[in-house]
């Protein structure tokens, strides 16, 4: 299939398997959940009754005081007591093999292309890293203001000019992930990045 560039009359040939694949929502959901789970730090730690310091002595005798029975001042029922089901450091990583991951990316790119949220441009260039210049470039092409820009390699002027905008993310091809692709309203890809994506996923 061919994709039309927005800012020129040129077209580029791309693989059907990458930009015209079937939409597989269960697979995309699984891969996105796994990606976000893998990004979790997993270092939370709490102490159980056994790990909290103190509490070795029975606070008062079992009978005769009129008070409720108590065996430790570190009971989970007490203030400063231990946690009943204490959280411990753990890994949240979910296994997703390479074929599934790439298939999910192809499905996302294909759906974005079908519904008009995928935009290919010949090139995106700024002569200076100014937010005003970047906004003018986006307005000239009517791209909107909720954007993911994908470049073939790090474009320092585009990155610096856009980093003050809360709904704009600029990445290179190596940083592509399913969560980012779905987060933004439109995905803008330059020609060099599009060729690299096509080669990578086809």
UniProtKB/Swiss-Prot annotation:
Domain of life: Bacteria
Gene giving rise to this polypeptide: rplD
Function: One of the primary rRNA binding proteins, this protein initially binds near the 5'-end of the 23S rRNA. It is important during the early stages of 50S assembly. It makes multiple contacts with different domains of the 23S rRNA in the assembled 50S subunit and ribosome.
UniProt GO MF annotations: rRNA binding; structural constituent of ribosome
One Pfam family of this chain: Ribosomal_L4
Family as reported in the entry's similarity comment: Belongs to the universal ribosomal protein uL4 family.
Subunit and partners: Part of the 50S ribosomal subunit.
SUPFAM superfamilies cross-referenced by the UniProt entry: Ribosomal protein L4 (SSF52166)
GO BP term, pick one: translation
Keyword DNA damage (UniProt): no
Alphabetical keyword list: Ribonucleoprotein, Ribosomal protein, RNA-binding, rRNA-binding
Protein name: Large ribosomal subunit protein uL4
Signal peptide: none
Cellular component terms (Gene Ontology): ribonucleoprotein complex; ribosome
Region (Disordered): 47-67
């Amino acid at each position: 299939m061919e994709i039309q560039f927005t800012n020129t009359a040129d077209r580029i040939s791309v693989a059907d398997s990458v930009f015209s694949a079937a939409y597989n929502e269960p697979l995309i959901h699984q891969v996105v959940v796994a990606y976000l789970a893998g990004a979790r730090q997993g270092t939370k730690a709490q102490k159980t009754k056994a790990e909290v310091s103190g509490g070795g002595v029975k606070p008062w005798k079992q009978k005769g005081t009129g008070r409720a029975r108590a065996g430790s001042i570190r009971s989970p029922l007490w203030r400063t007591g231990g946690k009943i089901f204490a959280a411990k450091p753990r890994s949240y990583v979910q296994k997703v093999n390479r074929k599934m991951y790439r298939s999910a990316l192809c499905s996302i790119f294909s759906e974005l292309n079908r519904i008009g949220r995928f935009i290919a441009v010949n090139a995106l260039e700024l002569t200076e890293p100014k937010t005003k210049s970047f906004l003018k470039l986006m307005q000239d092409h009517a791209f909107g203001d909720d954007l993911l820009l994908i470049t073939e390699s790090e474009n320092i002027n585009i990155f610096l000019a856009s980093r003050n905008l809360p709904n704009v993310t600029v990445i290179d091809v190596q940083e592509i992930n399913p969560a980012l692709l779905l987060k933004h309203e439109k995905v803008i890809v330059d020609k060099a990045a599009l060729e690299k994506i096509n080669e990578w996923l086809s």
